[in-house]
Regions:
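Aromatic "clamp/platform" in nucleotide-sugar-dependent glycosyltransferases that forms part
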Residues: 256
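Short alpha-helical donor nucleotide-sugar binding micro-motif in glycosyltransferases
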Residues: 235-236, 243-248
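Membrane-proximal helix-turn-helix segments that form the acceptor-binding/catalytic region
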Residues: 99-101, 110-144, 152
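Conserved donor-binding/catalytic core segment of Leloir-type glycosyltransferases
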Residues: 176-194, 200-204
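A charged, aromatic-enriched C-terminal amphipathic alpha-helix characteristic of glycosyltransferases
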Residues: 311-345
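Acidic anion/phosphate-binding donor-loop and adjacent secondary structure
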Residues: 157, 164-181, 243
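Short hydrophobic beta-strand element within catalytic cores of glycosyltransferases
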Residues: 273-276
């Protein structure tokens, strides 16, 4: 079966959505499917090569691609995905942008007028938010919609597939012992939407007001630079990220908008607890996330982890083990990818789920 994965941004952007498409392509190819990726050239970054990451998967980037496939999986972008596609195969709309589901996000993100939202979300984010209502009508033109299980109640369509993301748990695993220096990690874009300002405030409060002897580390920025007590790690390739997660004592995921952050799965699978913002998108059954509201809530959770590590080590390590076990049980590639294969076969053949 020929599967086309059609993405709204260049894979060179290398955000969470792009990473998901790369992993899905490799996993489907490993299941014997003939997979091609077609990307629009939005957000293209020079000097980033992705074809070497795809193995036998064909990758094409451009406008109005001629898509030849039995079924197409389209990361939905309002009023653009269909206009910029020429594909006759049955289509599955994939809801990966959190701004298409504003009810599941931090409502403070959407306060203010267009100028405020443009500043917080950027041009494409604001565009998606303002058109999310029209998107619900446009989705009728797709044979099916894919949404993550905890978000399906926010999606209106006659045929919704509730499938989680997945991870290669043999690759993402504990590879380092936790040393005695407590390390707190942020992984992601340094954007307001991602809550990087909250991480900075958390570091300032924890180190300053409470005097926690901890290192606060963040990917991105200029390597070696220290600002407000946060050490910048620069770009961290995936091979090194596995070790980074594993050696950290806590991962902070304070994003204000999300569908399902891969950071959560990567960290838990690597044996590290995750403190995440308490938004509907993070209320994930079966995953032992430590949910927190604002800086004060995250600070309380962090202090609890800090004290647990130094005063009740076995309880802390049990929390680490529980996180990995939950990912292996419900989100491993072996468990989840066959569900995607079944979805594509049903949509391509016109069968009911």
């Amino acid at each position: 079966m020929r599967v086309a994965l059609i993405h709204s941004h260049s894979l060179t952007y290398m955000g969470g959505g792009e990473t998901f498409i790369l992993r899905l392509a490799r996993a489907l190819s490993g299941q014997g499917l003939n997979v091609s990726i077609y990307s629009l050239p939005i957000g293209r970054r020079g000097g980033v090569e992705v074809k070497g990451l795809l193995g036998p998967v064909d990758y094409r980037e451009g406008l109005l691609p001629e898509v030849d496939a039995d079924v197409a999986y389209v990361t939905y972008f309002p009023m653009a995905s269909l206009a910029l596609l020429r594909v006759r195969a049955p289509r599955v709309a994939a809801i990966h942008s959190p701004l298409l589901l504003p009810e599941a996000q931090d409502q403070g993100l959407f306060r203010g007028g267009p100028a405020a939202l443009l500043n917080r979300l950027g041009a494409w984010g604001a565009y998606s938010y303002y058109l999310h209502g029209a998107a619900r009508l446009e989705l009728r033109r797709f044979k099916a919609v894919h949404a993550y299980p905890h978000l399906v109640n926010f999606v209106r369509h006659r045929r919704v597939y509730a499938l989680p993301p997945f991870l290669n748990v043999n690759r993402w695993r504990p590879t380092r012992e936790k040393d005695e220096e407590f390390k707190v990690l942020f992984v992601g874009r340094r954007a307001y939407e991602k809550g990087f300002d909250l991480f900075i405030a958390l570091a300032r409060e924890a180190r300053g007001r409470l005097g926690l002897k901890a290192r606060f580390l963040a990917t991105g920025g200029r390597e070696g630079e220290v600002t407000d007590g946060v050490e910048s790690l620069g770009f961290v390739p995936e091979d090194e990220l596995v070790n980074l997660y594993s050696s950290a004592h806590a991962v902070i995921y304070p994003t204000r908008a999300d569908t399902f952050g891969l950071v959560v799965l990567e960290a838990l699978a690597s044996g590290t607890p995750v403190i995440a913002s308490d938004i509907p998108s993070h209320r994930l059954p079966g995953l032992p996330l430590l949910l927190a509201r604002g800086v004060d809530g995250a600070l309380r959770q962090l202090v609890d982890l800090y004290n647990m590590f130094y005063s009740d080590r076995e309880r802390y390590l049990e929390l680490c083990r529980r996180g990995r076990e939950a990912v292996v049980r419900g989100y491993s590639e072996e468990v989840v990818v066959p569900q995607y294969v079944r979805m594509f076969k049903e949509v391509a053949s016109g069968l009911s789920p």
